[in-house]
Structure formats: structure tokens, C-alpha cells
């Protein structure tokens, strides 16, 4: 891989640092962060297994009987059925309400088998490390996450009140795997909107910052992490989401925004948002697999922050710095940013894989 770094200074535009990369390898592993504050790992971990129907409940019993689930750091894992978990949950501790979530689920595949822990190093590690043991569509949720995984070790604090979950899915066409993070991001924004509508609450305008950040009023409230492995002619994709629902730190949260608009309104619940997410995601995923991302583009572009964003790019060519202005038009078929220069030349912009902010590291190539 060959790389040349250059920087850009913008006046009334966004400040971007551009990294030009040349690589012929396809990108099947995409990641961004929702990490937690650093805490020492417990010597043991309790995982509660919960199913929507008798089918998933039998899966839970089988996993417990075989003691099948493991963690990558060799932490001792204790598997508990939902019916046995009463001693883990106190009425006043605001733990994730398993019954409330399961009652909200109306999907056919996603979210019907749930793993919950009051305190967990990483939900992503649970689903990715045990992918073959779990039904496709399984989700892992925790109340406190202290060793979250993120892009280039980025930190996303995960205190109580944050909705933190990871789930599994399978895909066969590796060319569209990088696009799944956009489907997930869109489903999160639509889920929040759906819950607000159902509860008669003011609409919280959650926006997507490409490729996988979620923003409200200019502040980050969430992020998406997608990883994949290839096995038996399928891509095993683990998807992680972190969303600030009821935690005012480290930035802001949905309920803080809601209180600012309507102080007396009912608050959003993590369980309701997660149930609405899987309802939206299952529909979007089926559309995406049947018709491609084109079927979701119009809605996605109404939700993201970048339409017609103008960017000044400085490229270093043979020791000479050349400036170009490009305007973001949308996404390419590969899921990267599509931009046009003032000379009408089309460009594809890629992240460099090194910066916390994707817009401080981009690839630019002519198309």
C-alpha cells in the first residue's frame, strides 16, 4: 500500500486532512467506535439468555447446557436463563428490561434471541467470538461496557443510560458488505423517529455523519461498528451500535435533547428504541438485499449531513501542492463518497483508516 499525506485549510468549509491511498484490495472490514471508559475487567461474567418464542428459548437452554459461549480474554462465563435472572436485576437500578424489549419485538429474524449482561467488557466480542454458536440475528446488550472495540482504539464512553448492543447477520456478496453500516445508521435514525411518533413526542432529528456517526444538534450521540469474517462462502458480519439515550455524558443524549424541547414529556426508553430499530432494520435489510442500496438512497440522503458539502483538497504531486475544490454528491456503488470537482471531474473519496474523524483523512481518486 502506498500513501501520500497532505492537509487542507478551509475558510467557511469544513477542515479536512486528505490522505491519498492506492490499494487494489477490496474493503470488507469497516469499523468505527463506540468504546467505553477504561475499567478493569471482572474475573467472571454473567450472561442472561432470553428468547422471543419457544424456539429461541430452546436455543438458550441448549447453550446453557453445553456452556457454549466464550469470551476472547478467557473470562469465566456464567450462562443464565431469563427465568433464573431475578437476582441480577433490582427494581430501581434501571437495568435493561428484557420483558419490555421482547414485548416490543415484531421481527421474523433479528433481535429474537437476546444476550444481556449488567456489566460487560464488549458486546461486540460476545457476538463475534461466538458467531457460529448463535442464531443469525442474535443481539447482545449491556448496561455498562468498559472495554468497547473501536476504530484505531478510539474511545466512546459507555456509562449507564447508553444503549449498547451488537448483533449478527450473514451476507454472501462481499461487494455490498461495506454498505451495511449505512443501512444500520439509517435504521437507528428511523427508529428514534418512530418511537417519538408513537409516544407523541417532539421529533428528535438524528443525523448521519458519514460513514458511521450519529449526531444531534452538532454533537455526537452514537456510532456504528461493523466487522466481518469470511467462512463457508458467507460473510459473518457483527454489527455494533452505541447510542446515548439517557446519559448526559460524555456529550449529550436523546433524553436531554427531548427535555430541552418539551420539559414535561415522557422519556425515551432503550428497550423501545432497540425494538423499533430491529423492526426498521429488518425491512431495510430485506430491501437492501433484494434491490440494492438504491432503494434506500433517497431516505439516506435526507438524513445525512453532507449533500453539496464543498471540500478543498490539497494533493501533493511530484513535490508540488495542487488545490482542487470538490462537492460531495452522494455515495458511489462501493459505498464511498462521490464528489465532483469544479472541472466536472468525478472523484471517489475514501477514509484513510488512521484518523478519529473520517473527514480528516480521505482518499481521492478519479472515476
Curated annotation (Swiss-Prot):
GO terms for biological process: biotin carboxyl carrier protein biosynthetic process; protein modification process. Expressed in roots, leaves, stems, flowers, siliques and seeds. Residues 1-37 form a transit peptide. It comes from the Eukaryota. Its EC number is 6.3.4.-, 6.3.4.11, 6.3.4.15. Biotin binds at residues 122-124, 145, 149-151, 220. Residues 105-289 form the BPL/LPL catalytic domain. Signal peptide: none annotated. One of its GO terms (cellular component) is chloroplast. It holds the Pfam family BPL_C. One of its GO terms (molecular function) is biotin--[biotin carboxyl-carrier protein] ligase activity. Belongs to the biotin--protein ligase family. It comes from Arabidopsis thaliana (Mouse-ear cress). Plays a major role in biotin-dependent carboxylase biotinylation. Catalyzes the addition of biotin to the biotin carboxyl carrier protein (BCCP) subunit of acetyl-CoA carboxylase. Can also biotinylate methylcrotonyl-CoA carboxylase. Is responsible for most, if not all, biotin--protein ligase activity in Arabidopsis. Is essential for plant viability and required for ovule development. Keywords: ATP-binding, Chloroplast, Cytoplasm, Ligase, Multifunctional enzyme, Nucleotide-binding, Plastid, Transit peptide. SUPFAM superfamilies: Class II aaRS and biotin synthetases. The alternative splicing of the 5'UTR of HCS1 mRNA controls the dual targeting of HCS1 protein through alternative use of distinct initiation codons. A small ORF (uORF24) located in the HCS1 mRNA 5'UTR is essential for the AUG choice. The presence of uORF24 favors the synthesis of a short protein form initiated at the second AUG, which consequently localizes in the cytosol. In the absence of uORF24, the translation initiation begins at the first AUG, allowing the production of a HCS1 protein headed by a transit peptide. Disruption phenotype: Embryonic lethality when homozygous due to aborted ovules that had not been fertilized. This is Biotin--protein ligase 1, chloroplastic. It catalyses: apo-[3-methylcrotonoyl-CoA:carbon-dioxide ligase (ADP-forming)] + biotin + ATP = holo-[3-methylcrotonoyl-CoA:carbon-dioxide ligase (ADP-forming)] + AMP + diphosphate + H(+); biotin + L-lysyl-[protein] + ATP = N(6)-biotinyl-L-lysyl-[protein] + AMP + diphosphate + H(+).
Amino acid at each position: 500500500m502506498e500513501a501520500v499525506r497532505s492537509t487542507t485549510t478551509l475558510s467557511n468549509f469544513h477542515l479536512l486532512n486528505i490522505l491519498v491511498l492506492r490499494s487494489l484490495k477490496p474493503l470488507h472490514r469497516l469499523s468505527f467506535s463506540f468504546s467505553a471508559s477504561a475499567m478493569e475487567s471482572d474475573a467472571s461474567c454473567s450472561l442472561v439468555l432470553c428468547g422471543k418464542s419457544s424456539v429461541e428459548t430452546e436455543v438458550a437452554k441448549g447453550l446453557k447446557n453445553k456452556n457454549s459461549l466464550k469470551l476472547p480474554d478467557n473470562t469465566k462465563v456464567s450462562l443464565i436463563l431469563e427465568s433464573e435472572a431475578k437476582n441480577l436485576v433490582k427494581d430501581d437500578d434501571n437495568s435493561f428490561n428484557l420483558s419490555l424489549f421482547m414485548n416490543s419485538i415484531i421481527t421474523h429474524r433479528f433481535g429474537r434471541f437476546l444476550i444481556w449482561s449488567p456489566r460487560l467488557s464488549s458486546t461486540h466480542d460476545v457476538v463475534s467470538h461466538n458467531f457460529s454458536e448463535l442464531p443469525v440475528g442474535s443481539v447482545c446488550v449491556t448496561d455498562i461496557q468498559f472495554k468497547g472495540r473501536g476504530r484505531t482504539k478510539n474511545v466512546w464512553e459507555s456509562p449507564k443510560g447508553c444503549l449498547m448492543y451488537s448483533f449478527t447477520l450473514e451476507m454472501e456478496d462481499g461487494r455490498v458488505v461495506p454498505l451495511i453500516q449505512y443501512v444500520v445508521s439509517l435504521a437507528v435514525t428511523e427508529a428514534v423517529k418512530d418511537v417519538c411518533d408513537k409516544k407523541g413526542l417532539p421529533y428528535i432529528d438524528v443525523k448521519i455523519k458519514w460513514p458511521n456517526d450519529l449526531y444531534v444538534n452538532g454533537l455526537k450521540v452514537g456510532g456504528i461498528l461493523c466487522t466481518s469474517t469470511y467462512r463457508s462462502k458467507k460473510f459473518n458480519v457483527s454489527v455494533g451500535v452505541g447510542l446515548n439515550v439517557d446519559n448526559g455524558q460524555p456529550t449529550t443524549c436523546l433524553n436531554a435533547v427531548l427535555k430541552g424541547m418539551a420539559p414535561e414529556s415522557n422519556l425515551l426508553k432503550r428497550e423501545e428504541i432497540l425494538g423499533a430499530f430491529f423492526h426498521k432494520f429488518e425491512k431495510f435489510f430485506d430491501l437492501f438485499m433484494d434491490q440494492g442500496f438504491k432503494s434506500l438512497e433517497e431516505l439516506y440522503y435526507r438524513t445525512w449531513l453532507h449533500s453539496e458539502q464543498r471540500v478543498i483538497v490539497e494533493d501533493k504531486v511530484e513535490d508540488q501542492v495542487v488545490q482542487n475544490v470538490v462537492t460531495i454528491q452522494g455515495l458511489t456503488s462501493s459505498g464511498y463518497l462521490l464528489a465532483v470537482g469544479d472541472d466536472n471531474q468525478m472523484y471517489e473519496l475514501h477514509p484513510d483508516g488512521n484518523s478519529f474523524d473520517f473527514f480528516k483523512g480521505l482518499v481521492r481518486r478519479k472515476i
